[in-house]
Amino acid sequence: MNIHEFQQWVKDYYQQRKWSDLDIFVRIGFLAEETGEVARAIRALEIGRDRPDEVEGTYREHLVKLTEELGDVLGNLLVIANKYDISFEDIL
C-alpha cells in the first residue's frame, strides 16, 4: 500500500466510525497520547521499563509494539492532514 492509498484508507476508516467528526483539539490530544506511547515503546527497547507490575518482553515484542505505535502516530497525522485536505504526498 502506498501513502496515498493509506491516507484514503485512514479517511474512510475514521469516517465510518465518525472519529473524523471529533474536534481538531481532541485529535491533537490523541496525537500527543500516541507520541507518548512511542516514547514508552522506545524506552522499553533501549533501557527497559523496570516496573514490578509489568512482565519484561522480548526485543522482538518491543519492536512490534513500537511499529504499532508509529502506525498510530502516522494515522493521527493523516487524519489531521485529511481535515485540511492536505495530501501526505505534498508533505513529503
Where are these regions (language model features)?
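Flexible "arm" and connector segments at domain edges
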Residues: 1-70, 74-92
